[in-house]
Amino acid sequence: MPQEFEDARAVLQKIEDAGFDAFFVGGSVRDTLLNKPIHDVDIASSAYPAEIKHIFKKTVDTGIEHGTVMVIHDGEGYEVTTFRTESGYQDFRRPDQVTFVRSLKEDLMRRDFTINAFALKEDRTVIDIFDGLSDLEHKIIRAVGDPHERFHEDALRMMRAVRFASQLDFKIEAKTLKAIEENNMLLGKISVERILVEFEKMMLGSKPNRGLEDMLTTKLNEYCPGFKDRSKELDQLTKYPLKLLENPEQVWTMIAWSLKLTPQEVMPFLKQWKTSNDLIKNVSATLQVLSMDKNDQNERLALFNAGEANVVNAIRVAQILGMNREAWLDTYQNLQIKDTHEMAITGKELIQKGIIKPGPQMGQVLNRLKLMVINDELKNESLALLNAVNKLQKDD
């Protein structure tokens, strides 16, 4: 049993000593059975919220209307949720009604997939009502009960299925896969932000090609921003070793490349996905580098504008696409300056020396100096830069 569970066993024991049932549940149990590290400890109990609050001295009402109370034990917070049933999913995401129950089976019946429907007792006994252990052994993702019902309860579960296929390298069971295809339009009811989280996790999983293939097979992509009618382009992605992708910037650069987007088209495309402005800026810069011809005369400027992290991202995406662009990093690292602030002279100094007056001309001169330094046409030294300014003014 992982240390996180060992630390929380006393919480289960205290609930059981009070006459109630308590179990570890959810993905952490699955990951424990797969010998993977766990991230969250979720506890489910037959005790109602008021009863949990009576058992423990320190509690916080984190989601009491849904049956969740945080118990503070040894300075750690553990969320304890009452066994419950759910009904009415008008938004295809959250239940309209939650009913507290005393039955573990009724609670586990509302879980998404059999591999997530385990309960683990304090004595390490695994409760497996839906043959999840068999599915875990055979690497199968299968909906609990009727897959159509599960996806109508929460349409995001369809994206979770393809995400798990990628993260775990599991196969989606035939009826579950068919139900995803038949209910794919429900994904349109889910917020883009939630789809984004699942999609990025899928693309950064250990087998992203598998997840993406399942996504295209079930046509979930038709209900994702900017992916409608782009199955052919997205399918081309599955021909590349996507497991080499390391971060969201590389994921979206790879996608932008496959959709033949220009750096300028990246912003409206990613705005649909509601990604951060930083990610949009980085993907645009990375794509700008990636789009260069091998001996592009603006190569040094593009690398300077991109910055080291985006140059590294461009090299990785190029590698995935079968291109060797390792030289870009050497070129970048040998630039005299990596930032405008590193210029050996500033506009303020030029004004103080009476060499130039404030205004548009000063900005133009400084830009020309910067470009000359970036292209190694000029040393980034005060005297050399001052001489260059005088020469530029005479020429003008």
UniProtKB/Swiss-Prot annotation:
Record's catalysed reaction(s): a tRNA precursor + 2 CTP + ATP = a tRNA with a 3' CCA end + 3 diphosphate; a tRNA with a 3' CCA end + 2 CTP + ATP = a tRNA with a 3' CCACCA end + 3 diphosphate
Gene: cca
Subunit-level organization: Homodimer.
Keywords for the protein's UniProt record, in alphabetical order: ATP-binding, Magnesium, Metal-binding, Nucleotide-binding, Nucleotidyltransferase, RNA repair, RNA-binding, Transferase, tRNA processing
Keyword NAD: no
GO biological process: RNA repair; tRNA 3'-terminal CCA addition
Domain of life the protein comes from: Bacteria
Organism for this UniProt entry: Pediococcus pentosaceus (strain ATCC 25745 / CCUG 21536 / LMG 10740 / 183-1w)
Function: Catalyzes the addition and repair of the essential 3'-terminal CCA sequence in tRNAs without using a nucleic acid template. Adds these three nucleotides in the order of C, C, and A to the tRNA nucleotide-73, using CTP and ATP as substrates and producing inorganic pyrophosphate. tRNA 3'-terminal CCA addition is required both for tRNA processing and repair. Also involved in tRNA surveillance by mediating tandem CCA addition to generate a CCACCA at the 3' terminus of unstable tRNAs. While stable tRNAs receive only 3'-terminal CCA, unstable tRNAs are marked with CCACCA and rapidly degraded.
Protein name as annotated: CCA-adding enzyme
Molecular functions per Gene Ontology: ATP binding; CCA tRNA nucleotidyltransferase activity; magnesium ion binding; tRNA binding
Binding site for ATP: G27, R30, R111, D154, R157, R160, R163
Pfam families registered for this protein in UniProt: PolyA_pol, PolyA_pol_RNAbd, tRNA_NucTran2_2
Organism taxonomic ancestry: Bacteria, Bacillati, Bacillota, Bacilli, Lactobacillales
Binding-site positions, Mg(2+): D40, D42
InterPro entries associated with the record: Bact_CCA-adding_enz_type3_sf, CCA-adding_enz_C, CCA-adding_enz_firmicutes, NT_sf, PolA_pol_head_dom, PolyA_RNA-bd
EC number: 2.7.7.72
Entry's family note: Belongs to the tRNA nucleotidyltransferase/poly(A) polymerase family. Bacterial CCA-adding enzyme type 3 subfamily.
Cofactor entry: Mg(2+)
Positions contributing to CTP binding: G27, R30, R111, D154, R157, R160, R163
Remaining remarks: A single active site specifically recognizes both ATP and CTP and is responsible for their addition.
Database matches in NCBIfam families: PRK13299.1
